[in-house]
């Protein structure tokens, strides 16, 4: 009887508190109470009024509310604001109560957006609080507009920050300045421990102050925090200074900006102990580099970039772009001769004794040893029909820009992250591609490194880097490649539509250098682009040779290689060490996905990759075309002989109408567990003869678990033929079937369901029916799906079959 007595005591306490708080409420709160009490639903309105009164005084009553019995607490939960609702979560769970429905309703009412159908929301509280944090940070939500969001006792940013797992920074770096402000120190400290993914979308040009704030933010979140992934999306015209800032900070480099406050965490960490050398010490290079050559080549690269920008945007306002430190100021230590070459005395604004800023990490010898071969390839980031222009040193250029004023940034990432090259005699002309990659007629190899990072520090770096639709200039590509060569903590790299062009060769060299580093963790590479200077299979071979420890490789090229047109001027081909004919060594690939451009692919090249990938478990070929069915058969035979661990095989957008014997060969493979033929025109020829052969092969295969046949014009006849796979005399263990986009009508689906019922095989897993002609007879379709759900899990949609008119006409 103790429990009921406690419940009654708590209930009486709640009523007493509610009555007292109601009497103490203001007239504004009391007026609605009278009107509510007089209505036909007086008891619920009164209880709700009491609950609102308790919610309004939670600062005093919180501990008592937490101790309320479960039924009463369950009625109060929807009346709490988001701050107390979040705080009471643990107590509610102990009482067997869930707040997920409340958070979902808050999402629908306040966020007014529908989550993606591909997103599986496991915790609506975390999702709401994360979105709420972003809206408050950007100023896109007014917390005073709704009582559920407004409470003077709580800071919206601080209270929601611990739920933020990913943060998106957009446009003009909105939110970066607010987060690093002193009043939000606790917010930033909380983010440093909770945030895992940092995303940048649609970035625009930013000023120096915004970049300085971003520098501090990245330092706190990456170097002293838990951020492990940085992703950049949709940046059509990347600002070089900002892009290189994000890259270098992600790689673990830190150098405070001019006039910026010192890092408190760095001071605490370094107090009482000597600095240690971590895995990044390989980047620091020699303590006495040849600065003259480095500075000379860096100055030439930067001068060329300024000249190119001036031509492209002659009317751009100076205030809208981040000014660069003057070349003369950044190269003070290079000597007076170099000063005179780069700037006339009239343009010098450097104070005596200015210290030269440190420079970027030195490339490893394996990366720099082959850079001389780049003279054969253009350095542009996209296909160039014209040869690159040549330029002279900037001596005597009156338009050279310098940094002026006390607010100018004297320490810039440009000062210590750039590729350097060997030495050239004064007065000689240099191509920008040769300067950028250091191909200077085989000069001293020691000149191919970078100046040491004497004043910069190395901290923890991210493990996942993603660049989506971010065009990379030569300068940006060189910076990325140089950082990659020693980025041993990197585990996954995604480069999607970045316009690499011939810079892909530098990327391969940097990946080869990274693979040679002790402790290299790179295991996943995703590469896609419109064009490639190498055919996709040669590029795949080069990547596999450069990264033998890679586990996941996804590569896609939309258009044929330039090498397919040898008549293009300047198309001299890749360096010989990139496309060597030597046999590919054994690698660790487990997953290989390839998207091919139009044109027949040489089967022997693909077979050579497959033979070296004995651990391959998943293979996906998209839009692959072979010269003949025999070539396709050669690939399948290679899979059977050399890839014994292969479990999943996928073909998409391939014409396999003439490869029916090869398809049967696959279906008889007793090692494959899942096969996908997506839009492969399987039943375009001889369907009456091929379908029985296909069903017979599947009935004898006891290892195949999943078969996906979307977009193959199966039709009702083909579906009914497939039903025989589940007959009583079948040894098939198929449990997943995808027959989407196959011109299936309701009557055929109903007959398919009846046959499954008749054979009584029981539930066989999942059946996918997207985009079929089920709307032609809605009643029959519902009956068919009802019957099917007794034997399997059905996933369908309401699709307008009139969209398939063209497909229907093509089958007439």
From Swiss-Prot:
LRR repeats lie at residues 487-507, 518-530, 531-555, 613-635, 636-659, 701-728, 731-752. Residues 354-381 have a biased composition (Low complexity). Residues 45-54 are annotated as: Interaction with Elongin BC complex. The Elongin BC complex binding domain is also known as BC-box with the consensus [APST]-L-x(3)-C-x(3)-[AILV]. The modification Phosphothreonine is found at residue 327. The gene is LRRC41. GO terms for cellular component: cytoplasm; cytosol; membrane; nucleus. Residues 387-401 have a biased composition (Basic residues). It comes from the Eukaryota. This is Leucine-rich repeat-containing protein 41. The modification Phosphoserine is found at residues 155, 276, 326, 357, 373. GO terms for biological process: protein ubiquitination. InterPro entries: Leu_rpt_41, LRR_dom_sf.
């Amino acid at each position: 009887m103790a429990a009921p007595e406690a419940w009654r005591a708590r209930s009486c306490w709640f009523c007493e508190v509610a009555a007292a708080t109601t009497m103490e409420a203001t007239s504004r709160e009391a007026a609605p109470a009278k009107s509510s009490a007089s209505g036909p639903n007086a008891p619920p309105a009164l209880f709700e009024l009491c609950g609102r009164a308790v919610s309004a005084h939670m600062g005093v009553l919180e501990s008592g509310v937490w101790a309320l019995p479960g039924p009463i607490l369950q009625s109060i939960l929807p009346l709490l604001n988001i701050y107390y609702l979040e705080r009471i979560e643990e107590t509610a769970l102990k009482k067997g109560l869930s707040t997920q429905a409340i958070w979902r309703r808050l999402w629908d009412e306040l966020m007014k957006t529908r989550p993606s159908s591909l997103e599986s929301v496991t915790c609506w509280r975390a999702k709401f609080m994360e979105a709420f944090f972003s809206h408050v940070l950007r100023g896109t939500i007014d917390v005073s507009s709704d009582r559920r969001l407004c409470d003077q006792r709580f800071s919206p940013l601080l209270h929601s920050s611990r739920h933020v797992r990913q943060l998106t920074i957009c446009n003009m770096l909105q939110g970066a300045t607010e987060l690093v402000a002193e009043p939000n120190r606790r917010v930033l400290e909380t983010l440093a421990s909770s945030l895992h993914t940092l995303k940048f979308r649609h970035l625009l040009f930013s000023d120096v102050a915004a970049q300085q704030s971003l520098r501090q933010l990245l330092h706190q979140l990456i170097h002293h925090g838990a951020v492990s992934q940085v992703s950049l999306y949709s940046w059509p015209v990347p600002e070089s200074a900002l892009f290189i800032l994000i890259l270098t900070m992600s790689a673990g480099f830190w150098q405070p900006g001019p006039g910026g406050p010192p890092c408190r965490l760095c001071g605490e960490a370094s107090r009482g102990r000597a600095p240690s050398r971590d895995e990044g010490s390989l980047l620091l290079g020699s303590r006495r580099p040849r600065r003259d050559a480095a500075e000379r080549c860096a100055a030439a690269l930067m001068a060329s970039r300024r000249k190119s920008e001036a031509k492209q945007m002659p009317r751009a306002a100076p205030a809208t772009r981040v000014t660069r430190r003057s070349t003369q100021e950044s190269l003070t230590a290079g000597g007076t001769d170099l000063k005179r070459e780069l700037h006339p005395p009239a343009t010098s604004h450097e104070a005596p004794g200015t210290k030269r800023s440190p420079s970027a990490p030195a490339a490893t010898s394996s990366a720099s040893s082959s850079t001389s071969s780049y003279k054969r390839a253009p350095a542009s980031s996209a296909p160039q029909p014209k040869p690159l222009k040549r330029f002279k040193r900037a001596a005597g250029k009156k338009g050279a820009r310098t940094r002026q004023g006390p607010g100018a940034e004297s320490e810039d990432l440009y000062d210590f992250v750039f590729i350097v090259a060997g030495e050239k005699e004064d007065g000689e002309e240099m191509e920008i591609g040769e300067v950028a990659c250091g191909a200077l007629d085989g000069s001293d190899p020691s000149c191919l490194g970078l100046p040491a990072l004497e004043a910069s520090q190395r901290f923890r770096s991210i493990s996942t880097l993603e660049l989506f639709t971010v065009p990379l200039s030569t300068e940006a590509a060189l910076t990325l490649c140089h950082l990659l060569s020693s980025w041993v903590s990197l585990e996954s790299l995604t480069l999607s539509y970045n316009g690499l062009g011939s810079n892909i060769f530098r990327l391969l060299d940097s990946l080869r250098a990274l693979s040679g580093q002790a402790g290299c963790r790179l295991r996943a590479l995703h590469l896609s682009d419109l064009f490639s200077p190498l055919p996709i299979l040669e590029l795949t071979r080069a990547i596999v040779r450069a990264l033998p420890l890679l586990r996941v490789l996804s590569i896609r090229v939309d258009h044929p290689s330039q090498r397919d047109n040898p008549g293009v001027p300047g198309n001299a081909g890749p360096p010989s060490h990139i496309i060597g004919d030597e046999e590919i060594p054994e690698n660790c690939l487990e997953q290989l996905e390839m998207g091919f451009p139009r044109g027949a692919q040489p089967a022997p090249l693909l077979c050579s990759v497959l033979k070296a990938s004995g651990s391959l478990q998943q293979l996906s070929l998209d839009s692959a075309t072979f010269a003949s069915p025999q070539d396709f058969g050669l690939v399948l035979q290679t899979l059977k002989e050399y890839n014994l661990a292969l479990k999943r095989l996928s073909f998409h957008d391939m014409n396999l109408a003439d490869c029916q014997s090869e398809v049967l060969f696959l279906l008889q493979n007793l090692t494959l567990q899942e096969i996908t033929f997506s839009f492969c025109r399987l039943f375009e020829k001889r369907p009456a003869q091929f379908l029985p052969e296909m069903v017979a092969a599947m009935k004898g295969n006891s290892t195949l678990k999943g078969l996906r046949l979307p977009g193959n014009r199966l039709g009702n006849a083909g579906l009914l033929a497939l039903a025989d796979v589940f007959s009583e005399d079948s040894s098939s263990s198929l449990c997943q079937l995808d027959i989407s986009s196959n011109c299936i009508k309701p009557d055929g689906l109903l007959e398919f369901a009846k046959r499954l019922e008749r054979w009584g095989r029981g539930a066989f897993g999942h059946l996918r029916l997207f985009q079929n002609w089920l709307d032609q007879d809605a009643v029959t379709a519902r009956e068919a799906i009802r019957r099917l759900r007794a034997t399997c899990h059905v996933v369908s949609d309401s699709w307008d079959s009139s969209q398939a008119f063209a497909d229907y006409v093509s089958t007439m």
